[in-house]
Amino acid sequence: MSAPRESLLELVDYVLGRLXLGFPVDFFPAGLIALNKTPQTIVFYKPYGVLCQFTDNSAHPRPTLKDYINLPDLYPVGRLDQDSEGLLLLTSNGKLQHRLAHREFAHQRTYFAQVEGSPTDEDLEPLRRGITFADYPTRPAIAKIITEPDFPPRNPPIRYRASIPTSWLSITLTEGRNRQVRRMTAAVGFPTLRLVRVQIQVTGRSPQQGKGKSAATWCLTLEGLSPGQWRPLTPWEENFCQQLLTGNPNGPWQKKFGDRR
């Protein structure tokens, strides 16, 4: 490749700190790599039954993100299972995706889970301590019993069993492993029937800063959205993301925009 090695590495570092498969890049004759189009980020309320991808090559195609979002080059920040609902960020900025999704940054993700049975507060203690599965141990979660939230009816509805009641839990994680909430509730004897991600709380603090220092916080919710709807980021959110990537999430912009918890 004829481009200077330093220039190439600098640009790859800008994309993600590593080259991310699936992200839009252009290869010019000179060998330089450039991002295709201005990075864009949106907030989406994923409905039940929708795949967290834009294509489905199965024999019987299922609903995908493409049925709701007609924007190019977007990729989910983390995933929601097909049978899960709620808050999903999508971005064309690979570095931002890494900063928001990687477990090392320990951003909080809150889920409301409708479970089978009537757990007590004591039943939730294993979730708070962390559960060790055969393939990994979970981090301690924030878990509590809540009243039934006011969500739109699910289509199709969950299958009720007349002899078994259901309850709602709020579970907050600082990691996002495959089907983690469902595995955790099943492990303590209360299988999840419906799962909705309701909040993502992003802190500007890096792991190296430690817990003792204050940091700007971006608390993202489903407010203003119905299932299947999406919105672009607000100016405040755009500024937060920009400063998050430059390593100065508590810079001068904080005085202007404040801490939107």
Swiss-Prot record:
Please name the Pfam families in this protein's record.
PseudoU_synth_2
- Species of origin reads Synechocystis sp. (strain ATCC 27184 / PCC 6803 / Kazusa)
Q: Which InterPro entries match?
A: PsdUridine_s_RsuA/RluB/E/F_cat, PsdUridine_synth_cat_dom_sf, PsdUridine_synth_RsuA/RluA, PsdUridine_synth_RsuA/RluB/E/F, PsdUridine_synth_RsuA/RluB_CS, RsuA_PseudoU_synthase, TruA/RsuA/RluB/E/F_N
Its recorded reaction(s) are:
a uridine in RNA = a pseudouridine in RNA
Which processes are annotated in GO (biological process)? pseudouridine synthesis; rRNA processing
- State the signal peptide span: none
Keyword list, A-Z:
Isomerase, RNA-binding
This protein is called Uncharacterized RNA pseudouridine synthase slr0612
What does the record give as the organism's lineage? Bacteria, Bacillati, Cyanobacteriota, Cyanophyceae, Synechococcales
Organism domain of life: Bacteria
